[in-house]
Amino acid sequence: MDRRKWVQWLFEAKTRYGLVILNYAVTSNHIHLLVLDEKGRDVIPDSIKLVAGRTAQEYNLRKKRKGAFWEDRYHATAIESERHLLACLVYIDLNMVRTGVVSHPSEWPFGGYNEIQKPRRKCVLIAYQKLAELTGFKTYDAFRKAHKEWVSESLANGDNFRQAQWTQSIAVGSKSFIETIKEKLGILAKGRKIIENEGEFQLREDMRGAYNANFDIEIGDIGGQNAYYWDVYHGNSCT
């Protein structure tokens, strides 16, 4: 029920703020959300506060309880388009397969895979054409077919392990992309390392600090006012 409520409030965030949603997965103990920041710096933090806040409020009312609902911080990563975005997309799709709950992402109802494969006419969450455009495809149908193949190949190859770049990086992409992000962050990026792995580059966060459950900034994080990288970069992001 709480997962379904979270998805409903995600749709409300899209309606209210114009949040551009590329993929998502609501698991048993955490959430992945892949979005595009193209409408201004307040859209993503406002949307997250709405979804998280209302979900927590409704849960507490239903359970007649008080106190924190979200017990852990959320982490945000800026992602370069095309192949890096594709990798993140599939990583999110396979989340519940990684945990052993399902054998295929189509079996999990609280994620974007099924909508990506079977676009809706009503209550649409995923920005279909934008997703195709950002991944380098001319048509959504071409993207959809390729997306299905990527997931199938990952499952067949056993390429379904946890990848630290999505949970411990400020940004993921090409070397030039990462250097641009670091340069724009200026002094805020001091001490953050650029790491290369098989042609993919990451700007790593200092994990001593991050967002807490109430969306405040803890000591050690580079952020401010619920947003760090979208102050300097408007693009794809995964939380």
Where do the language-model regions lie?
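N-terminal functional module of multi-domain proteins
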Residues: H32-L33
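Short Pro-Cys-Gly-centered "Cys-loop" motif that presents a nucleophilic cysteine in a tight turn
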Residues: M1-N23, T27, L36-T239
